[in-house]
Swiss-Prot record:
Name recorded for this polypeptide: tRNA N6-adenosine threonylcarbamoyltransferase
Binding sites annotated in the UniProt record for substrate: L134, V135, S136, G137, G138, D167, G180, N276
Residues involved in Fe cation binding: H111, H115, D304
Entry's transmembrane regions: none
Length: 341
């Protein structure tokens, strides 16, 4: 089965072709970072308009790259949520229009299920069951995964997601959008131990997260340095390092708890923050200490992309899941509501 995947949940237009027998044939991505940077964050209306502009050229690009023609496509998968409604509607309407024109099925895919399954595109994919850490700009969740659609939420953030905290903290200390990569870059030049930030909610049992207080702690630290005339580039690097260390250690502690609670020794990390090198290194060390394994996608498939949507949609289509031509998207969509395969 050859599936065209379309991703438009936020500020990246992703298109890919995935074949159930040959694997990923082509993928293309257009990032809107430059468009939104001047505003310090994503502007939903601008995001939607740019998706409209980029979608068809990217579809042509992946067809050319794969050496395929439209008549060879068996189905279309598109992101149906969660995400920005206007942006989601661009991908959904394009998918359903093409599906109607080509007389093929279209299926809406859960954005975070796409992220969760992205490591399946790698040479050494994880085997079920496993614990997944979904960590992005909109989500920080620990999930037990027994199969596709078989998800048990173990814990999640009570306020800001980890990726959101990265971006907001970066903005507070004067870094450009997107803030996560900027903090990671500056943290490499930070002096360890100059600042020590708290590890929120690690002093109590449970698997819930909270990052809003950590963001406030970073702001107060930066303001104190600024009041003392010490708001220079090195201080910015030191604050970035302290913040990143706090987030990484918090996530690592909670992952270790989740693995102990479930009795599993396989961990998948997925979502944009999973590209963070410090997080990967910390989780690899932790899994090594308990003789477990950690899995993640290549960096280009950690952030939003069409390949993960094509793959996830293909699995559900192969299992016989169908959908009518109604255009339906959801800004919020708990992953536990998905039907199991």
């Amino acid at each position: 089965m050859l599936v065209l995947g379309l991703e438009t949940s936020c500020d990246e237009t992703g298109v890919a072709l995935y074949d159930s027998e040959r694997g990923l044939l082509a993928d293309a991505l257009f990032s809107q970072i430059d468009l939104h940077r001047v505003f310090g964050g994503v502007v939903p209306e601008l995001a939607s308009r740019d998706h409209v502009k980029r979608m068809l050229p990217l579809i042509r690009q992946v067809l050319d790259e794969a050496g395929c023609v439209a008549t060879e496509i068996d189905a279309i998968a598109y992101t149906a949520g969660p995400g920005l409604v206007g942006a989601l509607l661009v991908g959904a309407s394009c998918a359903q229009a093409l599906a109607f024109a080509w007389d093929i099925p279209a299926i809406g895919v859960h954005h975070m299920e796409g992220h969760l399954l992205a490591p399946m595109l790698e040479e050494n994919p994880p085997q079920f069951p496993f614990v997944a850490l979904l960590v992005s700009g909109g989500h920080t969740q620990l999930v037990r995964v027994d199969g596709i659609g078989q998800y048990e939420l173990l814990g999640e953030s009570l306020d800001d997601a980890a990726g959101e905290a990265f971006d907001k903290t970066a903005k507070l200390i004067g870094l450009n959008y997107p803030g996560g990569p900027e903090i990671a870059r500056l943290a490499e030049r930070g002096v360890p131990g100059r600042f020590v930030f708290p590890r929120p909610m690690t002093d109590r049992p449970g698997l819930a997260f909270s990052f809003s207080g950590l963001k406030t702690f970073a702001l107060n630290t930066w303001q104190q340095c600024r009041d003392a005339g010490d708001d220079n580039e090195q201080t910015r690097c030191d604050v970035s390092l302290a913040f990143q260390q706090a987030v990484v250690e918090t996530l690592t502690i909670k992952c270790k708890r989740a693995l102990k609670q479930t009795g599993l020794k396989r961990l998948v990390i997925a979502g944009g923050v999973s590209a963070n090198k410090a997080l990967r290194a910390s989780l690899e060390d932790m899994l090594g200490s308990i003789k477990g394994n950690v899995y993640y996608a290549r960096p280009q498939f950690c952030t939003d992309n069409g390949a993960m949507i094509a793959y996830a949609g293909c699995q559900r289509l192969l299992a016989g899941q169908q959908q009518d031509l109604a255009i339906s998207v959801q800004a919020r969509w708990p992953m536990e509501q998905l039907p199991p395969l």
